[in-house]
Swiss-Prot record:
Residues 163-196 are annotated as: Disordered. Gene3D superfamilies: Ribosome maturation factor RimP, C-terminal domain, RimP-like superfamily, N-terminal. This is Ribosome maturation factor RimP. InterPro entries: Ribosome_maturation_RimP (IPR003728), RimP_C (IPR028998), RimP_C_sf (IPR036847), RimP_N (IPR028989), RimP_N_sf (IPR035956). One of its GO terms (biological process) is ribosomal small subunit assembly. Belongs to the RimP family.
Length: 196
């Protein structure tokens, strides 16, 4: 998260917690026409999977946070507030969240290049809270990344395990019709009748 997003997350987290929910993280996206402030919320880990986040939860958080933002005013200018569930491709914002999803695949964008790359995709192998690092397995190679160097990260869902992978066609591929080769290239094209 950016410094601005971190400050806003620290400001809003107690409000979200008071509603019995968890603030996973905040995205602050400035733009010339107005910024977007996106909050990702979820039910506390202890209540999962019995309870899931729903539209009513998002609406409650939106109302409360909106009122708080009007009073605190941490964003100058116009902005749009979005409150969302994390979804299956959930974003990851901190070491604790990476640790929760150890063994899963993630897509990561780095702030600064590491080994000549800013993007990597691999399995979350381990986290080291003391060192502030996350170890990924990328193309069968161990890659250690500082949590401070992560700009964005998202879980890469296992669509097959979720039962949502597209099925592969079986059998031979359908044959395409052959182009008509009976006409001679010297014959003039048929003329369309003109309306008069």
């Amino acid at each position: 998260m950016s410094d601005k997003a971190t400050d806003i997350a620290n400001l809003l987290a107690p409000t979200v917690v008071s509603l019995g929910l968890e603030l996973l993280g905040v995205e602050y996206l400035p733009a010339p026409g107005g910024a977007t402030l996106r909050l990702y919320i979820d039910v506390p880990l202890a209540e999962q999977p019995e309870r899931i986040i729903n539209v009513d939860d998002c609406e409650r958080v939106s109302r409360e946070v909106s009122a708080q933002l009007d009073v605190e005013d941490p964003i100058s200018g116009n902005y749009t507030l979005e409150v969302s569930s994390p979804g299956v491709d959930r974003p990851l914002f901190n070491l604790e969240q990476f640790a929760r999803h150890q063994g899963e695949s993630a897509k990561v964008t780095l702030k600064l290049p590491q080994d000549n790359r800013r993007r990597l995709q691999g399995r979350i192998e381990a986290t080291d809270e003391a060192a502030g690092t996350i170890t990924f397995i990328v193309d069968k190679t161990e890659v250690v990344v500082s949590a401070d160097n992560i700009d964005k990260a998202r879980i890469m869902p296992d669509w097959v395990a979720l039962g949502l992978a597209p099925s592969k066609p079986t059998g031979p591929a359908p044959k395409r019709p052959k182009p008509n080769t009976n006409s001679s290239s010297n014959e003039p094209a048929a003329k369309k009748p003109r309306a008069e």
